[in-house]
Amino acid sequence: MTRTSETTKSPAPELLTQQQAIDSLGKYGYGWADSDVAGASARRGLSEDVVRDISAKKDEPEWMLQARLKALRVFERKPMPRWGSNLDGIDFDNIKYFVRSTEKQAASWDELPEDIRNTYDRLGIPDAEKQRLVAGVAAQYESEVVYHQIRADLKDQGVVFLDTETGLREYPDIFKQYLGTVIPAGDNKFSALNTAVWSGGCLTADARINVKGKGLVSIADVQPGDEVFGVNIGCELERGKVLAKVASGTKPVYEMHVAGRALEATGNHQFLVARRVEEGKRTRWTAVWAPLEEIESGEPIAVARVLPDDSGTIFFSESELDIKNRTRQCLYFPCQNSVDLLWLLGLWLGDGHTAAPHKHMRQVAFSVPAGDPVHHTAIRVVSEQFGANVTVVNCGFIVSSKAFETWLAELGFSGDEKTKRLPAWIYSLPHEHQLALIGGLVDADGWTESSGATMSIAFASRELLEDVRQLAIGCGLYPDGALVERTRSATCRDGRIVTSTSWRLRIQGSLDRVGTRTPGKRGKPVSNKGRRQRYVAAAGLNFSSLSTDTVGFARLKSKTLVGEKPTYDIQVVGLENFVANGIVAHNSFIYVPPGVHVDIPLQAYFRINTENMGQFERTLIIADTGSYVHYVEGCTAPIYKSDSLHSAVVEIIVKPHARVRYTTIQNWSNNVYNLVTKRARVETGATMEWIDGNIGSKVTMKYPAVWMTGEHAKGEVLSVAFAGEGQHQDTGAKMLHLASNTSSNIVSKSVARGGGRTSYRGLVQVNKGAHGSRSSVKCDALLVDTISRSDTYPYVDIREDDVTMGHEATVSKVSENQLFYLMSRGLAEDEAMAMVVRGFVEPIAKELPMEYALELNRLIELQMEGAVG
């Protein structure tokens, strides 16, 4: 493990008197404005032209521009939030979305323009760096970082500390892999705005995803905590946990066809593509992520060759349907899946139906006549599985049992020839059982061709055949492309002509694995050479170097714009991609290498100088395995008569056993709307700490979130908020327990005076399977006078039994007894009030590294008994 050395701490600032401390709570010491030459000529309003201009000025790659434009459309569609504080005062048409105050980033303070240098000198930042109080400094003035520096020893250890623009330029692969994976553009209106003016495509609900324990479900029904397949760094399929699902709105979509699979996706949704790279006289293949609209027909796209067989036995709930039928027959029902049972269910899907001769009778019929090779096999399986006697009729046999019909319906086997579907749980079965079901379907309504090299199945239900296609893909078989429609006509005795339509699906591959029981319908095996070559080469192209046992590549057959549809996207822990319909789809910059501890904070300062300015900083932190980093940000702005907007997005990935502490000292002037989205993904044994101080702004809406995705992950939020006259601090936290034995702690303190308003808004969610999780929430509010207000909006969602949860909330006023007691000890009333306030916020104030937030030392006094004055 590598650690950076400690440095000498700064001299303690001069202590304030108690009266100065209480007075300073209502003062703002950073409201001066410097000359604003750049801001005076900046363009107002938001449009596609503005977004394109921002991207062009930053010389960004095309994919980033498209991500911005997509986010702009999301922003325009999403309504303003009506919960929380009143945001009607934001005039998006009057905001300046990009102001460039200097043409290049300075490497030393002396290189900064004089007016900007004077601003940061007054904030004390140059002195902070000279005294080595911070490991690295970044200073953002208006829209861009104007100064950046990192300690040489940290740089030598591989620590990356860059502004987001430089991170995009110098580390495009890492940046593209992680940006927008924790907070997608469609998360909320202001995350979309941030992405647009500083992302991720979407799929339609027709995209079906294999979810562990649930089977094949629509992407619209996938939930956080679900486990789905994705491609790992070795180009093999493995399960990953879903962090979030986002309904991304109605968008134009393409229908793409590849390897007998179809998928609808937006043009900017990324897929894994095999492309050739010229290296001198040699050509090699490499896998890259590319948006669908940039992929040409004929290019090889990653597809699943087979889904890993990670399923087990499914136990059916004990049936209470031991109803005796008219023949005094008592049926019993299987308690778990088996090869025989699945073959029989497949046979029923193809050649079965239910009937109701009268209201007290139900019949389950199998249209397998006595001459059919599987007639006797089917009767034997029914008898062994259910203890049922059958009645043989001309067209097959029947079981007269209402209980049998009800049991089938409970498992999802119901409907007629045009409405039957495969239930989702079938896709959670072992391959052997799935292949047995396909075998039953072939025995009922299928046949073989080319001496067993091809199997065909025909049904009246196109949807059922699409279900079978997905099942075959998961088992490693190769369905062909579009279903073939077949129409037949027949003339009845009365002269009527009846027309019927059916659909045919052809399947190839190792068909000897399919569990057919009709001798003439058995498939033949594929040679090892043939099996290895499937999806590793196409029409003279050989990309075997990229293919693995579970992932291959096939040419994109076509893509067609099919109109606008509702779309969705999901994020998957660690993999950042997922398999849908058998196709692989995707979804300030700090990187700390494995084992490196940055014990001295990295620090960023954000300053708005221009009136009506919109500042949209983007922070991305990746703490690799076993590392530690502390990041501190401070914010100030001038006081103007009209409002400005600060809308930030902070994404943090905390790898196994790493730890991140993120401290914010927000001291915006009272004409700034501070609307921030902050979220961390925390993996096995890792820890995320949010230390949040909100002193300024007109309105703050900020709820730092921790998604604990690995076992023994920890999340903590410690926050303090102060609201004075004309201020509303709507703050809180979100904790999502997505793995077992995770723990979270929320401590929130707020003080309101002079008619100010504070609100705590929090969520603790413990998902199913997150057993052994623990959470504690404590939010306390202090009202200094009778005209201020405090509200608490806690939400707790527990979906697991073995959980420890504690919640406590208080709202109190400074009592006359407290003041009387302190004043009886010789303190004046104002001094007594200051002491009460300091004592109230002390548990959080002592965690704030105020020696690094020099611009706030006259508002939060830590040196006086470790408390806020």
Curated annotation (Swiss-Prot):
GO MF annotations in UniProt: endonuclease activity
Sequence ranges assigned to domain DOD-type homing endonuclease in this UniProt record: 344-477
SMART domains: HintC, HintN
Gene3D superfamilies listed in its UniProt record: Hedgehog/Intein (Hint) domain, Homing endonucleases
GO BP: intein-mediated protein splicing; iron-sulfur cluster assembly
Modification after translation (UniProt): This protein undergoes a protein self splicing that involves a post-translational excision of the intervening region (intein) followed by peptide ligation.
Pfam families cross-referenced by the UniProt entry: Intein_splicing (PF14890), LAGLIDADG_3 (PF14528), SUFBD_core (PF01458)
Keyword 4Fe-4S: no
Alphabetical list of InterPro entries matching this protein: Fe-S_cluster_assembly_SufBD, Hint_dom_C, Hint_dom_N, Hint_dom_sf, Homing_endonucl, INTEIN, Intein_C, Intein_endonuc_central
UniProtKB keywords: Autocatalytic cleavage, Protein splicing
Family label: Belongs to the iron-sulfur cluster assembly SufBD family.
UniProt cross-references to PANTHER family, sorted A to Z: FES CLUSTER ASSEMBLY PROTEIN SUF, UPF0051 PROTEIN ABCI8, CHLOROPLASTIC-RELATED
Name under which the protein is recorded: Iron-sulfur cluster assembly SufBD family protein ML0593
